[in-house]
A protein has these predicted regions:
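C-terminal motif of bacterial Sec signal peptides marking the signal peptidase cleavage site
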Residues: 13-16
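Short, low-complexity N-terminal intrinsically disordered segments enriched in polar/charged residues
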Residues: 18-67, 71, 75
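Short beta-strand edge/turn micro-motifs at domain boundaries
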Residues: 21-24, 149-176
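Positively charged n-region of N-terminal signal peptides that target proteins for export
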Residues: 1-4, 18
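A solvent-exposed, acidic/Ser-Thr-rich amphipathic alpha-helical stretch
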Residues: 75-121
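A short hydrophobic beta-strand element
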Residues: 128-139
Length: 176
C-alpha cells in the first residue's frame, strides 16, 4: 500500500511539473486589444499594440529639433500638420509651424529629452487605421539666462513615416 501511495505521489508530481500544452485560440491571428477609443459618434474602436518602427522616426524628429534643423523637421511633417498646443491654440500647416519654430528656437534655446514612449493603433472600421505614439518629454528652455523645465506628454499621429497631428499636454516644473 505504501508503494502504491508513493507511486501515485511520484506520478502526480511528475505530471504537475510538465509545461502546459499551448492551446490554439480561434483568435490567435487577431491583434491584442489594449483599450478603446470612442469616435465622435460614440462608436467603440479597438486600440491595439502599435507599430514600434515609428519610434525611430520620432527620435529622428526630436533630434532635428535639438539640432535646430527646421528643413528636416518640415520634411517629416505633412503639409496639413495640425499641432494642438498646451494653451489651446491650433497651429495649422507647415508654414505656421516653420514660423513658430523660427521665432522660438533663438528666443529660448529649447532642448528636448525623451523620457518614455508607447505606440498604439486605432482600428477604424471602413477606414485607414490610425497610428499613434504617446510620449513623455522634458523641455529645458533658457529665458533671460534662467532655465525653465517643462514636462510634456504628446500624442503624435503618424501616416506612414510622416507626422500628421500632435496634441501637447503640459505641466511646468517649479523653479529651483
Amino acid at each position: 500500500m505504501k508503494k502504491l501511495i508513493l507511486s501515485i505521489a511520484l506520478i502526480g508530481s511528475l505530471v504537475s511539473c510538465q509545461a502546459p500544452a499551448e492551446k490554439e485560440s480561434e483568435h490567435s491571428h487577431e491583434s491584442t486589444v489594449i483599450g478603446y477609443e470612442f469616435s465622435d459618434e460614440g462608436e467603440k474602436q479597438n486600440l491595439i499594440v502599435g507599430d514600434v518602427s515609428i519610434i525611430d522616426t520620432y527620435m529622428e524628429f526630436i533630434q532635428a529639433h535639438n539640432d535646430r534643423d527646421i528643413d528636416k523637421i518640415m520634411d517629416m511633417v505633412q503639409d496639413s500638420i495640425l499641432i494642438k498646443t498646451q494653451d489651446a491654440q491650433e497651429l495649422k500647416g507647415k508654414l505656421i509651424h516653420r514660423q513658430v519654430l523660427e521665432e522660438w528656437f533663438p528666443e529660448s534655446n529649447p532642448i528636448w529629452t525623451v523620457r518614455w514612449m508607447a505606440t498604439n493603433t486605432v482600428e477604424v472600421k471602413d477606414g485607414e487605421n490610425r497610428h499613434w505614439l504617446t510620449t513623455g518629454i522634458e523641455i529645458i528652455e533658457t529665458l533671460d539666462e534662467k532655465e525653465r523645465k517643462r514636462e510634456q506628454i504628446l500624442d503624435v499621429n503618424f501616416v506612414g513615416k510622416m507626422i500628421k497631428e500632435v496634441s501637447i499636454y503640459e505641466r511646468s516644473k517649479p523653479l529651483e
